Amino acid sequence: NLLQFGFMIRCANRRSRPVWHYMDYGCYCGKGGSGTPVDDLDRCCQVHDECYGEAVRRFGCAPYWTLYSWKCYGKAPTCNTKTRCQRFVCRCDAKAAECFARSPYQNSNWNINTKARCR
């Protein structure tokens, strides 16, 4: 779920950046998403959105609300969960958190005018 995803992000980036910085970044990080991602970090969010969509289509999951079990080993969020939905959503979140950690954060892409830049 979204709360657990936030903790995964903190795990992967060693708390180097507050989680809320990712809530309104580029064209895809945060609510909704459209157009061409502005950079690699925004592309991580696009892939995460697509992964959640796949969870809904393939398994009928509710990814924003699905609780799962995971642990933080070093900087690696590791899923340890049973059901198909839990496993799939957990992996979506873990992959995105790791992607965030390896992608540069450009302050100029935070809180952008999405109507103008995300076509």
UniProtKB/Swiss-Prot annotation:
Stored CDD domains: PLA2c
InterPro entries documented for this protein: PLipase_A2, PLipase_A2_Asp_AS, PLipase_A2_dom, PLipase_A2_dom_sf, PLipase_A2_His_AS
Alphabetical list of Gene3D superfamilies matching this protein: Phospholipase A2 domain
Sites where the protein binds Ca(2+): 28, 30, 32, 49
Cofactors, names only: Ca(2+)
Localization per Swiss-Prot or TrEMBL: Secreted
Catalytic reactions of this protein: a 1,2-diacyl-sn-glycero-3-phosphocholine + H2O = a 1-acyl-sn-glycero-3-phosphocholine + a fatty acid + H(+)
Record carries keyword Calcium: yes
SUPFAM superfamilies according to UniProt: Phospholipase A2, PLA2
Tissue: Expressed by the venom gland.
Subunit annotation: Heterotrimer of alpha, beta, and gamma chains; non-covalently linked.
Family statement drawn from the similarity comment of this UniProt entry: Belongs to the phospholipase A2 family. Group I subfamily. D49 sub-subfamily.
Function: Heterotrimer: Snake venom phospholipase A2 (PLA2) heterotrimer that acts as a potent presynaptic neurotoxin by blocking synaptic transmission and synaptic vesicle recycling. May act by binding in a calcium-dependent fashion to neurotonal pentraxin-1 (NPTX1) and neurotonal pentraxin-2 (NPTX2), but not to neuronal pentraxin receptor (NPTXR). Also binds to taipoxin-associated calcium binding protein 49 (RCN2), a protein localized in the lumen of endoplasmic reticulum.
PANTHER family given in the database record: PHOSPHOLIPASE A2, PHOSPHOLIPASE A2 FAMILY MEMBER
Name of the protein: Basic phospholipase A2 taipoxin alpha chain
Species, as recorded: Oxyuranus scutellatus scutellatus (Australian taipan)
